[in-house]
């Protein structure tokens, strides 16, 4: 990665994304693969591009991402959060628009732990009256 780059760390569920942003042609590389190849679902690809589309930087910036942990939804959310933080590092004037869209806030929802005596976090064993 030559020249000036902007960095942002994004987190969502159990995923962590490290995002490097440089001036370029608009390509997004996730773990060495293009975003369209990395994510099977169209919604995941859309989530990743949301901050770029909102700030009208989709064609002017290249993005390189390293993402670990979690599944497709968590990883795409982590990448979106990381891209948002990198964009703020790139241009602080973008923060109000990104904040208004809700991209700056880290989604704090995590998986609830399984409790003893229950089948899942809240699901109890089936009760039989007779």
Curated annotation (Swiss-Prot):
- The primary gene name is rpsI
**The organism of origin for this protein:** Neisseria gonorrhoeae (strain ATCC 700825 / FA 1090)
* NCBIfam families linked to this entry: PRK00132.1
Q: Disulfide connectivity?
A: none
The answer to whether UniProt assigns keyword Magnesium to this entry is: no
Which Pfam families would you find in this protein's record?
A: Ribosomal_S9 (PF00380)
- Example GO biological process term? translation
What does the similarity note say? Belongs to the universal ribosomal protein uS9 family.
Give Gene Ontology CC terms: cytosolic small ribosomal subunit
Q: Which GO terms describe its molecular function?
A: RNA binding; structural constituent of ribosome
The UniProt keyword set, sorted, is:
Ribonucleoprotein, Ribosomal protein
- This protein's record includes keyword Zinc: no
The name of this protein is Small ribosomal subunit protein uS9
């Amino acid at each position: 990665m030559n020249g000036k780059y902007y960095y942002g760390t994004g987190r969502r569920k159990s995923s962590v994304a490290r995002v490097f942003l440089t001036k370029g042609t608009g390509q997004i590389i996730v773990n060495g693969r293009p975003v369209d190849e990395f994510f099977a679902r169209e919604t995941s690809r859309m989530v990743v591009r949301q901050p770029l589309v909102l700030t009208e930087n989709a064609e002017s910036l290249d993005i390189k991402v390293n993402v670990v942990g979690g599944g497709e939804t968590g990883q795409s959310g982590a990448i979106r959060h990381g891209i948002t933080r990198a964009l703020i590092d790139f241009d602080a004037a973008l923060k109000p628009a990104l904040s208004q869209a809700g991209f700056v806030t880290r989604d704090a929802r995590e998986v609830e732990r399984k409790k003893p005596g229950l089948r899942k976090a809240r699901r109890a064993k089936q009760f039989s009256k007779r």
